[in-house]
Amino acid sequence: MSQSVASRRTFLAASAAACGSAALARVAAAKPPLPLTLGIQLYSLRGFPVDQALDHAKALGLTQVEFYPGMFPITDDAAAIVAMKQKLADRGLTISAHGVNRFTNDAAANRKLFAFAKAAGVKTIAADPDPDSFASLDELVKEFDIRVAIHNHGPTHRYNKALDVLGAVEKHDQRIGACADLGHFIRSGERPTEVIRLLEGRLYGIHLKDFAEMQDKTKGVILGQGHLDVPAVMEALVAVGFPADGALSIEYEENPKDPIADLEECVAVARQALNQA
């Protein structure tokens, strides 16, 4: 064998080994899949009948939906609940949360809502609880092992700032926490990533929503086109350990009669951010 051939073989072997090592390094450095599942608050699709709304959710490539009461009313009709669960199963969808629901000091009415949630497979109830409802809720979240997540609604709402939510829940059962509507927190002048960090350990739902201005009266926009730093939000959610079965829902309230193109943009932005987190 000539010296040149031997040298070439030695070079090729070394190159192959180097390539193999590089490939292994890339595999080792690859990020594990994020424990976050993107879904949609079906209020975004309120302009459609429920079957069509679910079809749109599936077409958007989503696998979980958050119902609002207008599309899945609270009921003790077992057949109606089974029928809705079948609609979801037929489309490969699961239900992440239900809300926004009000709780009062009427313990029987609160129990009815929890019984509905249990039958429907709801793990998180997004809620606007009256202050005198918490004694009842402490008992119900233990009995049913279902979370209650306070939903903020902006500057005129009783749960305006993140500290308002935290103050309401911190002395109660750990399963009582927050559904942070990041758009409404923007309207309240709060930065979404700071809200997420403040609510760490009590954060069970997120509404991915964006507004043009950090003020009460403003316009909803495509995710990332206002004050919502979507990649930073995803990174913050991972950092605080947002639960794998939490409700991470896109909510887009503009153009209810024809929102699909806008929702496609929102989904693309959110997915890209998830891939970067």
Residue ranges and their predicted role:
Residues 2-37, 46-60, 162, 166-180, ...:
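Histidine-acidic metal/acid-base catalytic patches
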Residues 15, 51-54, 87, 91-177, ...:
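Active-site acidic/histidine proton-transfer and metal-coordination neighborhood
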Residues 31-34, 61-66, 90-95, 115-118, ...:
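A short alpha-helix capping/helix-coil boundary motif
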Residues 36-41, 65-67, 95-100, 125-127, ...:
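Hydrophobic faces of well-ordered beta-strands that scaffold small-molecule active sites
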Residues 41-45, 68-72, 100-103, 130, ...:
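Active-site beta-loop-alpha junctions enriched in small/polar residues
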